[in-house]
């Protein structure tokens, strides 16, 4: 079964009684690192949950994702330095180094995408037309 992390913006409602409209702006598959980091840190609602089908992405929640990514990038860079140190005496580490460099690059790309989502959340303070940014898992 495939599932997706969906990111939505919610335009401001004209009245309190008006139903929220969720506009899909991005979706990430289960094998995406964004999906994994959001699932671990934000715990998005599942679309089948009738009472709470969406989770609001707050500044604190997105910061938790960024902090977790930064921690993983930092520890991976530390591990890379260790591998590079041992590679001089043992060429078996070369493949590990190549894979770890790719992993770090992927994490940095993911961090950039999450920072873009953070910018959307920050923009809700400036754009009166946007009520919130939220997510769920379909």
What do these predicted regions represent?
Residues 1-138:
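Acidic (Asp/Glu-rich) sequence patches and key acidic residues
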